[in-house]
């Protein structure tokens, strides 16, 4: 799947999921989905992961724009035979843009996935984390074992 199409798909799914939560839940409302293990809990996150740096929206917007530019530049210079690296960048870009839109529209990020033992997060956060994991995995592999197309 082309890089920008995947990033846009991640962005669209993220924004649709947040729209569904915003229109069907009140802030701080929680719905058990799988017993006491998994809930849908609508929260406003004005900070970063774990609520760090709350209410620093301008900082987050600036950093996110810079990260998006770096991702696009990295993609431009990435060899075409590195599909897993391309996947990682698309996931990170789509997730970063999803949270950026929230910050620009609302001044906070909409979070709703609640595992009860971890801070509440969203699909954009998941895309970013999976993208970073794939990126690290690919960069740490010996050159001959990296996910290159034959």
Swiss-Prot record:
Keywords: Aspartyl protease, Cell membrane, Hydrolase, Membrane, Protease, Transmembrane, Transmembrane helix. The chain crosses the membrane at residues 59-79, 84-101, 117-137. Pathway: Protein modification; lipoprotein biosynthesis (signal peptide cleavage). GO terms for cellular component: plasma membrane. GO terms for molecular function: aspartic-type endopeptidase activity. Its main location: membrane. It catalyses: Release of signal peptides from bacterial membrane prolipoproteins. Hydrolyzes -Xaa-Yaa-Zaa-|-(S,diacylglyceryl)Cys-, in which Xaa is hydrophobic (preferably Leu), and Yaa (Ala or Ser) and Zaa (Gly or Ala) have small, neutral side chains. The active site is at residues 111, 125. Its EC number is 3.4.23.36. The keyword Transmembrane applies. The keyword Membrane applies. It is an enzyme of class 3 (hydrolase). It is a multi-pass membrane protein. PROSITE patterns: SPASE_II (PS00855). It is found in: Cell membrane. This protein specifically catalyzes the removal of signal peptides from prolipoproteins. This is Lipoprotein signal peptidase. It comes from Moorella thermoacetica (strain ATCC 39073 / JCM 9320).
